[in-house]
Design a protein with these regions (language model features):
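A short, glycine/acidic-enriched catalytic loop
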Residues: 45-75
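Short loop/turn segments at strand-loop or loop-helix junctions that form parts
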Residues: 38-46
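Alpha-helix boundary/capping residues
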Residues: 27, 70, 138-142
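Short acidic, S/G/P-rich loop/turn micro-motifs used as interaction or catalytic elements
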Residues: 17-19, 46-50, 82-86, 109-111
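Short His-Asn-centered micro-motif
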Residues: 42-43, 54, 76-82, 106
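Active-site-proximal C-terminal subdomain of hydrolase catalytic domains
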Residues: 84-155
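Well-ordered, non-membrane alpha-helical segments in soluble/globular domains
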Residues: 1, 21-26, 54-65, 86-91
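A domain-level signal for caspase-like cysteine endopeptidase catalytic cores
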Residues: 1-37, 72-79, 91, 95-98
Length: 155
């Protein structure tokens, strides 16, 4: 997907919170292009407001604290391997703590693969300046798929 969309991609498997933290640190301090990345794409299982690493659930609040201000201006996007279902206060907490511009994902897990919609979403993020314009264009292009996967964006 990254190659087809001309996106910079870094693949790193993480099986523990320490592994995720190590990968984040490497990304932040060893990758000279980090500031240019608009989207941090996370493909990991989990439940509505948590991710699962090595059979342990970590809340998005814990993940926000791990990212602590280091995602300034980025969009954190979750594939549909986990549900993203946040209350307004939870979303705002995540955004405030991480510094992210938005958090996005799906209300439906892997009944259908989100690859096609993810690809279009990433391309639109490169073209559009405002996340509201991205979402509007995404729904115009793929309304049925957005509905099927229950696409969500909190900003």
């Amino acid at each position: 997907m990254a190659f087809q969309s001309k996106l910079t991609s870094i693949y790193k498997a993480c099986d523990s919170i320490e592994g995720l933290e190590e990968s984040l640190t490497t990304l932040l301090y060893d990758d000279n292009n980090f500031k240019a990345y608009e989207i941090i794409y996370l493909v990991m299982p989990g439940e509505a407001n948590s991710i699962c690493l090595n059979d342990y659930l970590y809340s998005l609040e814990e993940i926000a604290e791990l990212f602590d201000g280091r995602m300034k201006g980025k969009i954190i996007h979750f594939a549909n391997t986990k549900i993203l279902d946040l209350e307004e206060e939870e979303a705002q907490y995540f955004l405030d703590i991480t510094g992210a511009r938005a958090i996005s994902g799906y209300g439906v897990t892997a009944t259908a693969n989100s690859y096609v919609l993810d690809k279009i979403f990433f391309e639109l993020c490169q073209k559009e300046e405002y996340v509201t314009d991205v979402v509007e264009a995404l729904f115009e292009k793929q309304y049925a798929l957005c509905q099927l996967l229950d696409f969500r964006l909190y900003y």
